From Swiss-Prot:
Gene3D superfamilies on file: Fervidobacterium nodosum Rt17-B1 like, Heat-shock cognate protein, ATPase
Species name: Mycobacterium tuberculosis (strain ATCC 25618 / H37Rv)
GO MF annotations, alphabetized: acetylesterase activity
Lineage: Bacteria, Bacillati, Actinomycetota, Actinomycetes, Mycobacteriales
Protein name: Esterase Rv3036c
Catalytic reaction equation(s): a fatty acid ester + H2O = an aliphatic alcohol + a fatty acid + H(+); an acetyl ester + H2O = an aliphatic alcohol + acetate + H(+); a butanoate ester + H2O = an aliphatic alcohol + butanoate + H(+); a hexanoate ester + H2O = an aliphatic alcohol + hexanoate + H(+)
GO cellular component, one term: plasma membrane
Entry's family note: Belongs to the RsiV family.
Designated gene of the protein: TB22.2
Key word Secreted present: yes
Ligase as UniProt keyword: no
Amino acid sequence: MRYLIATAVLVAVVLVGWPAAGAPPSCAGLGGTVQAGQICHVHASGPKYMLDMTFPVDYPDQQALTDYITQNRDGFVNVAQGSPLRDQPYQMDATSEQHSSGQPPQATRSVVLKFFQDLGGAHPSTWYKAFNYNLATSQPITFDTLFVPGTTPLDSIYPIVQRELARQTGFGAAILPSTGLDPAHYQNFAITDDSLIFYFAQGELLPSFVGACQAQVPRSAIPPLAI
């Protein structure tokens, strides 16, 4: 459920004040306003839904970030408008946090979006989408390019994440190696001078009732980064 909107097939919808298909998305084009700190705030509502999103407008790879916001907004509104009216409107909230490391021009920038979505199921869903950028090379940073080649970072990261999540949640069940050593679960992260922060969607590493979670891993305890 948590990835429904990101993978939904989008159908045509006409929304007054929103950009036509193919138009470059922007804060104003999304119906938002730029507030202090170069943060775009988008709020929209109707009889069937409420939508509230905040995200930066000065990220170096802004197109990728705004495209993801737009895709999720459009998918959510299409699903909500095509569903029966209910007592409580469908809800989507998106917030963001930012991190950085180093000093320009040898620096990185991270933006992490957190989505909360209620589509009327038994349990709302929460997930993350992270964007990382190397200002020195003008290239996005992914988990595949994050570490020096020839290293095995998850051998160090996995046990730290397991201990940190157990400490935070009090949930003592072990994360199986088949899950904890799978790079697919570490795609959403932020880079700081001292640590990597990994973000996990609801149900990704721990049972859904635990909720979305994050774990901070000291850079001193893992292989060197390729940045």
